[in-house]
Amino acid sequence: MRKTMNNFDEETFVPYENTDWHYISVYQILSEKFIEKYKNKVDWHYISQYQTLSEKFIEKFKDEVNWHYMSKYQTLSEKFIEKYKDKVNWFDISIFQTLSEEFIEKFEDKVDWYRISKYQKLSEKFIEKFEDEVYWYDISIYQKLSKEFIEKYNLTIPKSCWLYKTKKEKLNYIKENTNYEVIDNNYILVYKSVRDDYKSVFFPNKYKYEIGKTYESNCDCNIDEDNSFGLSAWSEQGALDYYSEGKLLLVKINIEDIGTITFYNKIRCFKLTILEEINE
């Protein structure tokens, strides 16, 4: 896990002969001004992965950044992706960037349809239009479909997929199989560990959590996938076991927003609200 350095001040920093630029590029939260000042020293592969960069900055240093990492770890607009369509990694773009159906259609020959079928939110109309490109098994377990659509295409939904579970079914599972406390039969209070700067541990450039705010994401609803996409939360101990070097947050998740609860009682959800920071 990424751990930030202590007592690092960009204003007073003076490099020396044995300065570990790899360590700084990975573990210190750097400003774009600092990165530019030491552009010939920093490790651009790790800058591309671990630092939050603006599109303007990426453009300025387009020959230095790692475009594979740009496509995976930075949040890019469709306009920016289109401008640098020959530089970005379309495999990662198809997974890690949020794409509109219009954009996917425009670049249908570049996107990875297997990943599009799994990671992007698609309408039934769009799926039908590109029925020869999409991967139907993934469509059946990752896209929320109407009963009529499922019957029309003779799709089979495995029992391990929670995508169609009702609120009542989720509620019963929680009460029978976990120790999570259910409040008013409507929501649960659980925990999320984040970095010291309140950013996501796994995707620091995509989520920075603030008290009182609600966050949404697409979510893998398959119970047998322990580590997958979606907003995650645990018991207090589970959150600390995952990452204990940063902040611990109390979060609220409505029952209907739960995507699944894995065998290890890890929660993946579509939406959660940050309530407060837990001070030990």
Q: Could you tell me what each predicted segment is?
A:
Residues 138, 189-190, 250:
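Generic structural signal for residues positioned in beta-strands
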Residues 216-280:
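ADP-ribosyltransferase catalytic core
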Residues 1, 10, 212, 222-225:
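Catalytic phosphate/metal-binding cores of nucleic-acid and nucleotide-processing enzymes, i.e., regions
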Residues 1-178:
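Alpha-helical scaffold segments
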Residues 61, 96, 107, 130, ...:
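Broad hydrophobic/π-residue packing in well-ordered secondary structure
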